Amino acid sequence: MMSFVQCGTWFLLTLLHPSLILAQQSNVDELGCNYLGQSYESRDVWKPEPCQICVCDSGSVLCDDIMCDDEPLDCPNPEIPFGECCAICPQPSTPAPVIPDGNRPQGPKGDPGPPGIPGRNGDPGLPGQPGLPGPPGSPGICESCPTGGQNYSPQFDSYDVKSGVGGMGGYPGPAGPPGPPGPPGSSGHPGSPGSPGYQGPPGEPGQAGPAGPPGPPGAIGPSGPAGKDGESGRPGRPGERGLPGPPGIKGPAGIPGFPGMKGHRGFDGRNGEKGETGAPGLKGENGLPGDNGAPGPMGPRGAPGERGRPGLPGAAGARGNDGARGSDGQPGPPGPPGTAGFPGSPGAKGEVGPAGSPGSNGSPGQRGEPGPQGHAGAQGPPGPPGNNGSPGGKGEMGPAGIPGAPGLLGARGPPGPAGANGAPGQRGPSGEPGKNGAKGEPGARGERGEAGSPGIPGPKGEDGKDGSPGEPGANGVPGNPGERGAPGFRGPAGPNGAPGEKGPAGERGGPGPAGPRGVAGEPGRDGTPGGPGIRGMPGSPGGPGNDGKPGPPGSQGESGRPGPPGPSGPRGQPGVMGFPGPKGNDGAPGKNGERGGPGGPGLPGPAGKNGETGPQGPPGPTGAPGDKGDAGPPGPQGLQGIPGTSGPPGENGKPGEPGPKGEAGAPGVPGGKGDSGAPGERGPPGTAGTPGLRGGAGPPGPEGGKGPAGPPGPPGTSGPPGLQGMPGERGGPGSPGPKGEKGEPGGAGADGVPGKDGPRGPAGPIGPPGPAGQPGDKGEGGAPGLPGIAGPRGGPGERGEHGPPGPAGFPGAPGQNGEPGAKGERGAPGEKGEGGPPGAAGPPGGSGPAGPPGPQGVKGERGSPGGPGAAGFPGGRGLPGPPGNNGNPGPPGPSGAPGKDGPPGPAGNSGSPGNPGVAGPKGDAGQPGEKGPPGAQGPPGSPGPLGIAGLTGARGLAGPPGMPGPRGSPGPQGIKGESGKPGASGHNGERGPPGPQGLPGQPGTAGEPGRDGNPGSDGQPGRDGSPGGKGDRGENGSPGAPGAPGHPGPPGPVGPSGKNGDRGETGPAGPSGAPGPAGARGAPGPQGPRGDKGETGERGSNGIKGHRGFPGNPGPPGSPGAAGHQGAVGSPGPAGPRGPVGPHGPPGKDGSSGHPGPIGPPGPRGNRGERGSEGSPGHPGQPGPPGPPGAPGPCCGGGAAIAGVGGEKSGGFSPYYGDDPMDFKINTEEIMSSLKSVNGQIESLISPDGSRKNPARNCRDLKFCHPELKSGEYWVDPNQGCKMDAIKVFCNMETGETCINASPMTVPRKHWWTDAGAEKKHVWFGESMNGGFQFSYGNPDLPEDVLDVQLAFLRLLSSRASQNITYHCKNSIAYMDQANGNVKKSLKLMGSNEGEFKAEGNSKFTYTVLEDGCTKHTGEWSKTVFEYQTRKAMRLPIIDIAPYDIGGPDQEFGVDIGPVCFL
């Protein structure tokens, strides 16, 4: 039903005067309307709400409220249908009447139809029969139903309301009784539009409609002036961690680091492959094969023969019993160093076992460092003379070449041509086989002899001892980067960077939807004072702003805490040679290596300490006695030598006790020179001869050929450490020894090259540091350090086979001997030859009984030259290291196969002179052969196991900065870190250009600043900023992966010889011991007397020219060159892309107060002053001019009457007509007084004096106008209105501060708070405590709003503010908790803008403590003084205080509220 039906009466629409609301409109087109997002045609009528109806009128929306009749309905339960506004009586549930359309049941109730055509008033009729229900009508407009009808606006008359047409209304008739509801009528045809009704009077404003859609953007206004910088926003949360960036460009190689710790000993490597069989030698001339004769009877002892050529090595015999300790032999020349094995891990030190029998001699250890000067030993008895060595050919000394890099193993060279047969020598008489004589001193060095025929390959020797690690190699190509490490702990916040320049203004964005009201901004520049605004509601915080342009790089931050070490990256390339590392622990002895071939003679070592005098050995044939030469001075400490091959680990035996001294034997008679006899069996020991006179020093003789291996002698005492030998080729990896004790920490390795970024790891929360884990698996072996301190000297090894002597070359890798050459042709018969020439050499048999000496054969043709050995790694000369302790001798290894001849090495330094030897005949000088080709490179050994990670080394020198890598993709979002400590203030940025004018906003009322909002949501991660400046040197990082082993260092210098020991007493001859293993080769004795010149050897064929050697190792890094000249300034690079705005830096520190501004313009003219006091009388004036002529005198009798009437006496004449001057009393004093008063008032307006009558604006103005005033109380009127609201303040005339006291100024000291809760918390004094109050300031007699206004103006006039609060405590902590060492129990202060000031956190909101006496509970009263200073004057004064450590029965406090001072 329509609402006018519900009201019960039809009213003429002409009487309705509705109040229409013109809603916000938007011209959709010329006729249509847009309302709340819906489009309507012109003249459409709709109901946005049940009690509101709207119509579209040519683009304008007119809406009105539907008012219902207040009269009660005549039904028991009226109801409001859905979508309707007014209540109706419910329909009785009767069958649906027949309607014109046909028989159909009544449908659901339709919407109200539009109003029908109003008819004229008829006469009141009788109550009619109930009519049929009418069709539903649309809601009518009801404004004042209580008047008996509804107001329908005449404006609706002309609109299509989807139903009848409204006509002009008639006058209302009396209301008839309501009829029962009729049946629904059929819809009428649309009526034609009625004529427009009269315009109704405007209604009262309706309630504001909902906000319309935003209007189109206005034109851009002129640029406004830039506002002051707002307060810094809170920093956004860290952006998500970006994806790992692409790998950076490979940086340049870093400066070599220090060598790492000595690695653990690696496993023994597999045996190397057997070398190729050498080419067969040239066939020699056929000799007459002789059968081996049966051993004849032992002949008489012949004169000692010449030293025979070395025989083939015999098979290793069974170990003989340990013989008695022999006398110390001369130290042999250092053997070639074995290949460097991986250092073994040191084994646990075993307990000292029982003294074992001395083991057979091990293979010779490498030369140790010179030991310290020992005490002189007793002079030992001279040994019996040895057999004369066969003279060697004297070689010419070649210049020492620069050590080449290791050459590849060359192919076996072809056999050289056969030499011509030598002339047969004269046969000497056969002598008895002489006893083995003691070794004679070496004779003068002979010329180089011919090479012997190749021997049968000997058995493969055991692996040599591990060599010392070579020097580090050059830095390799940087390895691939390791995987990305886990995020480190958050470091402390660095200092704030300088603020960046203001970026250019961005393009104007479209207007966004209205955001929430932002927090009130900081005060702008001083404007003209406005009237007090209405207090607004605090706004909610605005959303985060767009990212701005990145600022310039910040100042250098402090070093962050070191992050946890990342995972080891892949192994990098070998680094450049590092500095020498400290000595590592001795490794456990490795397995005995196979016997190596003899190397070239090493550099002579200095003489070591004399050993203890051993028991005298059996005497040899009498030699020419020589005196022992003086020992040289001790040499400087050499570097650690390369470790020799170690034998299998044996238990350390205790050194044997020295045997009893034997008596000195008589010297034997030297025999004549005979042919070399076959080695006879060992005869009984002869008596020792008397020591011979010391012979003159001869030139050093050539080194004799190697004799057959004698039975092992007893182990000698440890000799002095020899010099460092040349490093040999690298051996295969040895088997792992037992784990040794932890070595000393090595030097720091070089900084590794940064690896590529690893794949993106998931961001995990940073956990607390865990306990130290178990040691991890062994890492890869670190780069070997420089040679450490010499290890204990090994026992003397068996003497290796002697190669053909040549100039000392780099030791080659031992090659296999070539096959024996074919028999040579038969030589010319020698004189007096008893036996035939010897047959081809058979395999070595066991030692048979000594046969009779055979005749000397004809000298065979020169054998083919053997293949050259591989070039060894050149060792660098190391720095001298401290001497090592002598080690226990190891057991001897089995004999190794002889090596191929190595190329000649550089000449060694002169050794200390040996005992004089018997002079040998001098040979003619032979031509030196050319250097043989280098041998082929051996197969690489298998890698050893990873060693245990070394301790962190000292930090290496910083490498040069790498090239900048390409930009990485953003990492994943990190966990939000704790707030950083406040950084130092940044510099003020330059003022940016004014931005474009924004859309004009509606003027809002100034709200009080709200409390700090919650932090905004995280901004999008910014793009990478430009790189910052170089940071301070960080703490040591975790050690990088060890580099590959470097090349060996150069050999160290030769140390000086040791001093001569005292001569020992001659011991008695001991019984013959069982033959002992051969002792280590002694050091060269002093130079013997010059031997006779040997026969001229045949000229050897020229050797094949060797391959070109590899380039030498890179030298150590040179010292930095002088700085180059300053380069020209480069052209400026192109501008980079605009980066995002960095996070807001913290506000800078409060700047110093500015200079006083200029004096303002004169104020407006003041009011008229009060009337001044009357001035003093002036001086008499000058006489006036003569007056006009007087009136005619009396005449004719009538004058008396005239005179009586108008004469002066009667007062009838005006004084103007008299002769006396006028008395004009001009009060000059009054005028001057008024001027002075006006002038004073103007002066007091321009320069107020701070009195109640002339208050100043603030104390700073007062100080500028009246600098002579002293500090004290004055009146100020900051709002410059009526002076009646001036306030009394304290002016500090030294600073210009305006200080306002609190009222009251103290909080009494007592127990204010009882806390029943278990947890303590901050409790605000004014908000929560019983009897508490918030602090007020100023004169309490003035109204509170007056003080608020004056304070507000005072804040606007001030650039900074400060205030002190004194907290008196009794058993209450105010700031620092002495027991816990933190400030968690410190007070909070609340500022006037409801901001909180704390002890720690954002520096803008932290107070300082001037005195802290409340650090513990003492039961006594004490105090803590807080101070807060800020450049944001709106934050002060402090209005409340919140203690934390209160609530206990014995906890009391009070407060002194200091004045708040504005400047």
Swiss-Prot record:
Region (Disordered): 97-1195
Post-translational modification as stated in the protein's UniProt record: O-glycosylated. Prolines at the third position of the tripeptide repeating unit (G-X-Y) are hydroxylated in some or all of the chains.
Location relative to the cell: Secreted, Extracellular space, Extracellular matrix
S-S bonds: 1259-1291, 1299-1461, 1369-1414
GO MF, any single term: protease binding
Cellular compartments per GO CC: collagen trimer; collagen type III trimer; collagen-containing extracellular matrix; extracellular matrix; extracellular space
Basic and acidic residues bias: start-end ranges: 228-240, 265-276, 822-834
GO biological process, one term: wound healing
Region (Triple-helical region) location: 170-1195
Residue ranges with Low complexity bias: 186-198, 250-259, 310-321, 354-379, 399-429, 481-502, 606-615, 637-652, 678-691, 907-934, 945-960, 1068-1084, 1120-1132
InterPro entries: Collagen, Collagen_Structural_Proteins, Fib_collagen_C, VWF_dom
Record-linked PANTHER family: COLLAGEN TYPE XIII ALPHA 1 CHAIN, SI:CH211-266K2.1
Summary of the function given for this chain in its UniProt record: Collagen type III occurs in most soft connective tissues along with type I collagen. Involved in regulation of cortical development. Is the major ligand of ADGRG1 in the developing brain and binding to ADGRG1 inhibits neuronal migration and activates the RhoA pathway by coupling ADGRG1 to GNA13 and possibly GNA12.
Protein name (record): Collagen alpha-1(III) chain
